[in-house]
UniProtKB/Swiss-Prot annotation:
Known role: Causes symptoms of mild intoxication and transient paralysis in insects (A.domestica).
Protein name from the UniProt record: Venom protein
Organism the protein comes from: Rhopalurus junceus (Caribbean blue scorpion)
Main location, first listed in the record: secreted
Tissues/organs with expression: Expressed by the venom gland.
Keywords, ordered alphabetically: Secreted, Toxin
Subcellular location: Secreted
Amino acid sequence: KEGYPDGQNGKKIPCAINDNISKTXEQA
């Protein structure tokens, strides 16, 4: 959960920032 590729922007974002984000790894 360090960071997964975000399909929306095609760049890696930290998934562990928020408990909600860590589940999908996507930025809202």
